[in-house]
């Protein structure tokens, strides 16, 4: 990233900001009323707008990203690098067309994530973009993949380790070649409507940036999400995977496993031997017993160095707080879902209404991913608790997460997190916001520590 304006230039800018050589004046930032970060102020002065769409993205989202980086404790020089990188990767094509977005947003198709600190690591900020181009939704690119691939091509100059081997593999094996037929299907009403099938994520480490690709398979004639057998030839072509074999055994033999529905894949854009391969599933169930069965793969996973049952109990306590369930909920009882009021959904929008219908089964229960990359004996498993915004506002979500983090002895960045959210909420205030949070994810690491991530939508 330093090559955009030169590494030494970034170092000098960071030193100037840190020593207040630059006369900085805080300004209001549109919907985000928090003062501009010093790094954002400098990047905004250095980088001109590249058109109205770019300006819209930058004005809305750059203050939010800058606040996340600042509150997460990134060094100023790294904040500058990331904001410059983001400025140069913002889509320049209009995404406001009549289009089914993969992301549950109406402002810009983007999702942030805040990976919480651990005993050895500070928080990490990430974002996922649904890119659009002039050809998105046309016969040339009916499933909106070209814009995401072009975005990765543009970043390859500053991310030299970027590798698209698995993108090429999965695009050739999970989709049909005849683009005209996708258009004909959608126009005739015999198939699903056109929608994006690819997202790009950027993970901003303390010293480097990495990328990840999300794919949702789409075959001609497909109705709803692709079924498990449609994934298998593409995954198995990558080579033997004991983790995959274990997962398949669980999916076919466990009462909980047979109820899991696949809905996508993601992988790191690196050499395949170093990449994760995450297989995403949705469950209609939300009981403790269900959670335990999945996170242990039906007792196939056990840990000698820590009490896994205790870890799952701790995760379930967070899920109950987020989903507004009683503390004394019996282990075999599910957290009941309630219909979402129209005032908190987009049911009046016919495009978004279709999306809401398709996602109903996903949002009703828990979600999981299983890392099945070749090489591991057992998959790492991440659990996602959906935020039911009809039951809890974002201040309530923030309180649930931060209280839980403090109870785990991990409260160092809790005040920073709330300040960041308050900036995203702006004048409305967190108590009147429903929907900044989309999910909270938890993974039990191999050392027993809980890896926790908040997923956030633009305010």
Curated annotation (Swiss-Prot):
This is Prenyltransferase penI. L-tryptophan binds at residues 107-108, 111. Pfam families: Trp_DMAT. Keywords: Transferase. Pathway: Secondary metabolite biosynthesis; Alkaloid biosynthesis; Mycotoxin biosynthesis. Prenyltransferase; part of the gene cluster that mediates the biosynthesis of penigequinolones, potent insecticidal alkaloids that contain a highly modified 10-carbon prenyl group. The first stage is catalyzed by the nonribosomal peptide synthetase penN that condenses anthranilic acid and O-methyl-L-tyrosine to produce 4'-methoxycyclopeptin. 4'-methoxycyclopeptin is then converted to 4'-methoxydehydrocyclopeptin by the ketoglutarate-dependent dioxygenase penM through dehydrogenation to form a double bond between C-alpha and C-beta of the O-methyltyrosine side chain. It comes from Penicillium thymicola. One of its GO terms (molecular function) is prenyltransferase activity. The keyword Chloroplast does not apply. Belongs to the tryptophan dimethylallyltransferase family. Substrate binds at residues 126, 276, 278, 280, 384. PANTHER family: INDOLE PRENYLTRANSFERASE TDIB-RELATED, PRENYLTRANSFERASE ASQH1-RELATED. Transmembrane segments: none annotated. Its EC number is 2.5.1.-. It catalyses: quinolinone B + dimethylallyl diphosphate = peniprequinolone + diphosphate. CDD domains: PT-DMATS_CymD.
């Amino acid at each position: 990233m330093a090559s955009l304006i030169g590494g030494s230039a970034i170092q000098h800018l960071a030193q100037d900001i840190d020593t207040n050589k630059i006369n900085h004046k805080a300004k209001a930032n549109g919907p985000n009323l928090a003062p501009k970060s010093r790094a954002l102020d400098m990047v905004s002065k250095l980088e001109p707008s590249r058109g109205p769409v770019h300006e819209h993205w930058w004005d809305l989202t750059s203050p939010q990203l800058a606040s996340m980086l600042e509150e997460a404790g990134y060094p100023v020089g790294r904040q500058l690098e990331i904001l410059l990188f983001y400025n140069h990767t913002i889509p320049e094509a209009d995404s406001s067309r009549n289009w089914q977005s993969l992301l549950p947003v109406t402002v810009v198709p983007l999702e942030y994530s805040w990976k919480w600190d651990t005993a050895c690591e500070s928080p990490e900020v990430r974002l996922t973009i649904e890119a659009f181009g002039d050809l998105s939704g046309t016969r040339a690119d009916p499933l909106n993949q070209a814009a995401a691939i072009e975005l990765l091509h543009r970043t390859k100059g500053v991310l030299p380790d970027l590798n698209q081997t698995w993108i090429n593999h999965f695009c050739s094996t999970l989709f049909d070649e005849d683009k005209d037929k996708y258009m004909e299907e959608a126009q005739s009403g015999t198939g699903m409507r056109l929608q994006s099938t690819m997202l790009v994520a950027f993970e901003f480490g303390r010293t480097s940036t990495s990328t990840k690709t999300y794919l949702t398979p789409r075959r001609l004639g497909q109705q709803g999400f692709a079924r498990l057998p449609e994934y298998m030839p593409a995954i198995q072509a990558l080579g033997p995977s004991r983790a995959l074999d274990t997962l398949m055994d669980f999916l076919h033999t466990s009462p909980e496993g047979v109820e899991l529905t696949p809905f996508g894949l993601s992988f790191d854009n690196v050499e395949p031997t170093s990449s994760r391969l995450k297989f995403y599933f949705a469950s209609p169930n939300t009981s403790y017993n269900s959670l335990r069965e999945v996170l242990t793969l039906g007792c196939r996973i056990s840990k000698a160095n820590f009490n896994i049952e205790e870890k799952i109990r701790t995760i379930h306590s967070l899920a109950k707080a987020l989903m507004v369930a009683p503390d004394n909920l019996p282990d075999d009882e599910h957290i009941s879902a309630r219909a979402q009021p129209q005032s908190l959904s987009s049911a009046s929008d016919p495009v978004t209404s279709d999306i809401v219908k398709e996602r109903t089964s996903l949002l009703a229960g828990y979600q999981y991913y299983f890392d099945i990359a070749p090489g591991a004996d057992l998959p790492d498993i991440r659990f996602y608790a959906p935020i039911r915004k009809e039951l809890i506002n974002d201040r309530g979500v923030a309180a649930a997460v931060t209280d839980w983090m403090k109870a785990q002895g991990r409260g160092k960045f809790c005040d920073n997190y709330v300040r960041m959210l308050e900036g995203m909420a702006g004048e409305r205030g967190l108590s009147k916001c429903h929907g900044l949070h989309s999910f909270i994810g938890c993974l039990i690491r191999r050392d027993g520590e809980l890896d926790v991530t908040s997923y956030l939508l633009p305010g």
